[in-house]
Amino acid sequence: RYGSYDRRGRLSNRVSIEQRPAEVENRQRLGDWEVDTMIGKRHKQALVTLIERKSRLVLLRKVEQRTAEAVEGAITHLLKPWILDVHTITADNGKEFAHHERIAEELNADFYFAHPNAAWERGSNENAIGLVRQYFPKKQSFDHITLEDTELVMNLLNNRPRKCLDFKTPIEVFSEQSVALNT
């Protein structure tokens, strides 16, 4: 029902966004990521969305079910190639992030959680979801979305000039400052 919330317990060992270093909030370095899931029609499948806070680089992956296992696999798959550029990950309090400790250990990163019902604390990701929704509308089923579809949308978004980046593209900003690409 509208206004109801999940009462099935809380995530264990969650670290509040208040503990997150100030440099994350100020977008001073590359490697601070925000994560969320976009739910498809009938709440079956989902898209895991990751956005790097400084460069606004967007990563997407479809999961068949919005379970902690599926989301963990998607996050580690998406961020493994950029492991040198992963310092923090910030999520909401969804049950799909129950394996946050395993994700943090695998990627050698710190995992933080925003306050409940405080979407503005992860504004970059909420904005990115709005951009992704231009390609995958809210009422659309994710049944027919392929890996190629998500890669095309990532390519379009990451090559779109952004005013907040002085009209550079996210891929340009990320490439200029990436540890993984510059080593």
What are these regions (language model features)?
Residues 1-47:
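Mobile-element integrase/transposase regions
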Residues 36, 50, 56, 75, ...:
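Mobile genetic element proteins and their domesticated derivatives, centered on retroelements
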Residues 39-43, 60-83:
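Active-site beta-loop-alpha junctions of metal-dependent nucleic acid enzymes
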Residues 43-45, 53-58:
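Coil-to-beta-strand transition motifs
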Residues 56-61, 113, 138-140:
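Short small-residue beta-strand/loop micro-motif enriched in glycine and branched aliphatics
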Residues 91-93, 98-101, 106, 113-134, ...:
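RNase H-like two-metal-ion nuclease catalytic core shared by retroviral integrases
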Residues 138-183:
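C-terminal domain-tail junction helix/linker
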